[in-house]
A protein has these predicted regions:
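Core AdoMet radical
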Residues: 2-10, 21-40, 49-114, 120-124, ...
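Charged helix-capping and loop-helix junction motifs
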Residues: 10, 41-45, 138-142, 178
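Extended interfacial segments that mediate partner engagement and assembly in macromolecular machines
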Residues: 12, 16-17
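Conserved C-terminal portion of the radical SAM core fold
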Residues: 29, 79, 105-169, 181-195
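Short, small-residue-enriched loops and turns at beta-alpha junctions
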Residues: 33-38, 128-133, 175
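N-terminal active-site wall of soluble small-molecule enzyme domains
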Residues: 41-48, 182-188
Length: 195
């Protein structure tokens, strides 16, 4: 499926169509890592349109500077989701050898910049399947605890998307997580963090 960047008119049409489907009040706006086409000015205008239709506005976009997140909060931004993918900095280079996404520290520090900007809700997670999930989730839990202590007014959520083998000899995860292991992880995180 080819990627596309919606015009603001197309975006408004999509928001109206979603509202016709039911009383939805939450929306997640997602972009690729392309600041030239979908940077802070584009996101600010998108949020201005979205807030006419939805009460809770979240984004899942490339990591931004703290000032960018701060500006977007003035346009109605409530939350940001940013997956670290893996906390293994050496293996991260293999998955993202070049381009903006290749900057491990820039990505791992993104939740700090969100907290500094006063973002109300921060979603984070690792991609289960890239590396040993127990190790990655341990680092995720430590990162979460640090953020909770540093930006204590912010709400947090954690996500555990499991990667699966792609058809036709496509991407193959390094580790497959079973349903039992997902349950184990969920229970462990509930014990670790009651929120």
């Amino acid at each position: 499926m080819p990627r596309t960047i919606l015009t603001f008119e197309e975006m408004e049409d999509e928001f109206k169509a979603i509202k016709r489907l039911g009383p939805f009040e939450n929306i997640l706006l997602v972009t690729g890592e392309n600041p030239a086409k979908a940077g802070v000015p584009y996101l600010a205008q998108a949020l201005d349109i979205a807030k006419k239709y939805f009460a809770n506005l979240k984004i899942e976009v490339m990591p931004l500077k703290s000032e960018g997140y701060k500006e977007l909060t003035h346009h109605g931004l409530n939350g940001v989701i940013c997956f670290q993918e893996t906390y293994n900095s050496e293996r991260y280079k293999i998955y993202h050898p070049r381009g903006m996404k290749s900057k491990f520290d820039w990505r791992v520090d993104a939740p700090d910049r969100m907290g500094q900007a006063g973002v109300h809700s921060i979603g984070m997670g690792v991609l289960i399947g890239l590396e040993d999930w127990r190790t990655d989730v341990t680092f995720l839990a430590r990162h979460l605890r640090y953020l909770q202590r540093t930006y204590w007014r912010t709400k947090y959520s954690v996500n555990f998307p499991r990667m699966r083998p792609a058809e036709n000899d496509g991407f193959q995860p390094n580790v497959l997580m079973t349903d039992k292991e997902l349950a184990q992880l969920t229970f462990a995180m509930r014990i670790f963090d009651h929120d």
